[in-house]
């Protein structure tokens, strides 16, 4: 199974709609002059989703040997309107989750 097929399966499972791969977009996000995210965001057309016609998806290295890869999907809903803003939304969610876990 290819990465694209894996991501299509995850989109179907999480969002309940089929997805067709549209394009692969390289994204690099920096903060204070340092690269904090660098990878390929896969863009999918969604078929029948009630709120959007696009999803962004990629694989994320968790750094956890027991669960090394995470499939990430972000729907094209404000503020995630481009591959870059989808990555930014993901990063912000990760920061919020980490802060909540520490509280």
Residue ranges and their predicted role:
Residues 4-6, 65-103:
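Mixed-charge, Lys/Arg-enriched low-complexity segments
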Residues 1-22:
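Extended non-catalytic interaction/regulatory regions in multidomain proteins
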Residues 20-84:
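Acidic, low-complexity, intrinsically disordered interaction modules
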């Amino acid at each position: 199974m290819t990465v694209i097929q894996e991501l299509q399966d995850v989109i179907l499972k999480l969002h309940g709609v089929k997805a067709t791969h549209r394009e692969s977009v390289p994204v690099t996000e920096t903060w204070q002059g340092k690269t904090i995210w660098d990878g390929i965001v896969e863009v999918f057309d969604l078929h029948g989703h009630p709120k959007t016609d696009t999803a962004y998806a990629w694989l994320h290295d968790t750094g956890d040997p027991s669960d090394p890869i995470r499939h990430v999907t972000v729907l094209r809903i404000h503020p995630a309107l481009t591959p870059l803003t989808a990555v930014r939304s993901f990063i912000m969610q990760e920061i919020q989750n980490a802060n909540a876990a520490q509280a």
